[in-house]
Amino acid sequence: MSSLGYNILYNLINERQDTWCERIVYPHTNSIESNNPMKNFDIISFSLQFEEDYFNVLKMIKQSGIPLKRKDRSENDPLIIAGGPCATANPMPLSDYIDVFVIGEGEVTINKFLDIYLENKNLDNFLDMDGIYIPEFNNNAKIALINDMKNAYHITQPIITKTDKEDYKTVFSDSIMLNVSRGCTRGCRFCMSSYLYRPLRETTIKELVNIALKTRENTNLNKITLIGAAVGDYYDLEGLTKALESEGFQIATPSLRIDSLSRETLETLKKSGLKSITIAPESISTLRERINKSISDEKIFSVIKNAVDLDFNIKLYFLIGIPYESKEDIEELANYIEKIANMHKNRNYIKFSINPVIPKPQTPLQWEVYNFKEIKSKTRYLKKKLRKYNVKFESPKKGLIQYILSCGNREVGAVIEKSLTEEVTLKEWQSYLPNYNINDELPWSKIDIGIKSNFLKTENRRLKTKKQTPWCGDSPCYNCGPCN
């Protein structure tokens, strides 16, 4: 319910005179607005933000009394669609269960989609649209994106649900979601957001301040959350934070890129009421080179020192299982984290999250494997070494399942369905492990996000050689595809 896209589509659909949109939140199968059962709606749309959502999608369909598989549904059943980053990157694992996938930014397609649906519900009528993949036809689908943030839908009347039910409370329910930018062209090789929604598109400071003022007038909300895959790369982040702070807004952001955090920016954020910052060094310097995240240790430690001086709570994200990572690298990572933890006299103020790298579709890591045995061993070592610090670890098994859901084919749907009624063993999950060569046709090959395959292959080779691809914001165009 906190998803920006989810909120945009809710508003867009309800602005039409011929449609009405309500919300249903797992584990419920009745709507928030009218308590109407899920099976009574004409269209059911799921937002797939994380691969783990797949289990809940199938549970909701089954519990609602709608036939689980699309082949078993009739014209009397709701049309079931899905969108979001996971649907855009690789819709295959759920393709036996979902009728239509929306590829890209739904606000581009939603009105035309509804116009066609209201005129004629036959699925083949949607085939001429960009941003639509229909499993029944296995058609080629081209991503649909807003070309300019001037044409984007900015929310000035957010959904505010007044409820005591914890299930319905959202992460950003008490703040204005300000869509600073979309897309990211930094090219971190493990990150799906770096590739799915290129190119980078930004909203001007003037427009953002106007949106914030109008939303405050409508809602009385005074806290702003800056939303975007590349908030830290905003062309004038310092100018934006100062402009919002001068209007009396409190500013928060889920995460910021380290090299965007000057002392002055941190001071402005602190003055506006921000208490915590989240940053992602990812790993030690040699492994950052592999994943194309070229931030110096000097800059990382400078930002942390400034954050400590300004009395911020700090959360840092690290990765393990980066391709070509050695035992010595993990030992160095443990020492690196210890050094950071000891920068504050109170260790409770600095928290760490260590997660396995999950190879993702549509990225240079899509041909890499998830080595469960190695990740399990590395996790065990780091838990022992860092036990006196505030460190949380993602489960290696959970990472394995996420990898299978991310990069799996249509057959993976069967094991997701099986998990609804019985426990699936680790051995059975492992039987679905992908194993792709760089010249294989991949399960998601029908989905064109605009990135050239040869560009991803080049980036995969550079991963091996630790060769950097500088950010295209500061460098000549690499002809990766989307800007064309």
Predicted ranges, named:
Residues N179-Y195, P470-N484:
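Local cysteine-cluster metal-coordination motifs and their immediate loop/turn environment
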Residues Y235, E264-T265, R288-I291, I320-E328, ...:
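Flexible glycine/acidic-rich beta-alpha junction loops that bind and position SAM and/or redox cofactors
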Residues I43, E52, N210-K315, L319-Y349:
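Conserved SAM/AdoMet-binding glycine-rich loop
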Residues P135-M177, K452-T465:
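N-terminal [4Fe-4S]-dependent radical SAM core
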Residues I13, I160-M192, R216, K275:
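N-terminal pre-triad scaffold of radical SAM enzymes
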Residues K385-N484:
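Radical SAM enzyme core and accessory elements
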Residues I8, I61, D96-I98, Y117-L118, ...:
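Short secondary-structure boundary/capping segments
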Residues Y26-N140, P361-N409, E417-E423:
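Glycine-rich beta-alpha loop elements in corrinoid/cobalamin-binding modules
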